[in-house]
UniProtKB/Swiss-Prot annotation:
GO cellular component terms given for this protein: mitochondrial inner membrane; proton-transporting ATP synthase complex
Any GO MF annotation of the entry: proton-transporting ATP synthase activity, rotational mechanism
Domain of life assignment: Eukaryota
Gene Ontology process terms (BP): proton motive force-driven ATP synthesis
Matching InterPro entries: ATP_synth_F0_dsu_mt (IPR008689), ATP_synth_F0_dsu_sf_mt (IPR036228)
Membrane-topology annotation of the record: Peripheral membrane protein
Name of the protein: ATP synthase subunit d, mitochondrial
Keyword Oxidoreductase: no
Purpose of the protein: Mitochondrial membrane ATP synthase (F(1)F(0) ATP synthase or Complex V) produces ATP from ADP in the presence of a proton gradient across the membrane which is generated by electron transport complexes of the respiratory chain. F-type ATP synthases consist of two structural domains, F(1) - containing the extramembraneous catalytic core, and F(0) - containing the membrane proton channel, linked together by a central stalk and a peripheral stalk.
Gene3D superfamilies referenced in this protein's UniProt entry, alphabetically: 6.10.280.70
Subunit relationships: F-type ATP synthases have 2 components, the catalytic core F(1) and the membrane-embedded component F(0), linked together by a central stalk and a peripheral stalk. The central stalk, also called rotor shaft, is often seen as part of F(1). The peripheral stalk is seen as part of F(0). F(0) contains the membrane channel next to the rotor. F-type ATP synthases form dimers but each monomer functions independently in ATP generation.
Gene: ATP7
A Pfam match: Mt_ATP-synt_D
Species of origin: Yarrowia lipolytica (strain CLIB 122 / E 150)
Amino acid sequence: MSVAAARSSAVKVDWGKIVSSLGLTGATVSSLQAFRKRHEEAKKNAYELQNQPTTVDFAHYRKVLKNQKVVDEIEQHFKSFKPVTYDVSKQLKTIDAFEAKAIEDAKATEGKVNQEIGDLQKTLENIESARPFDQLSVDDVFKARPDLEKKIEEMVKKGRWSVPGYNEKFGSVVLM
């Protein structure tokens, strides 16, 4: 991203809209406000530094200092100084690759979440459309769980009238 593009995007940030559109609350809002404050301070400092003079008055230092040789040497180094340029294309490519992977992962997660939401909607509709428990008949239960019918028939044939584990789980209701 170029410096001009970064500046224009920084100017266009609507902080209030970010908070309201994302529905942020509590600690997130306070963190965002702290970030905004640091951003404003950094912008102010950068502006102040840009407006400071960048020239060195070597004539003044020649008058003030006795050692003219040092001033000449520093002036020569100052004039011959060229800032080192760094090739950041590798880092930018790495960042772009990371960003692409993050977007891909986010889309995959979005798909999973949407599928889960759909499943939950179906479950909710099923729950809302189900008949109340007190209106169910034994035939309805057997239709939903055919294995229970066979299990109950087997228990009746063997003369077992209690469900194994019921008393341990729900307690005994015998009064005597």
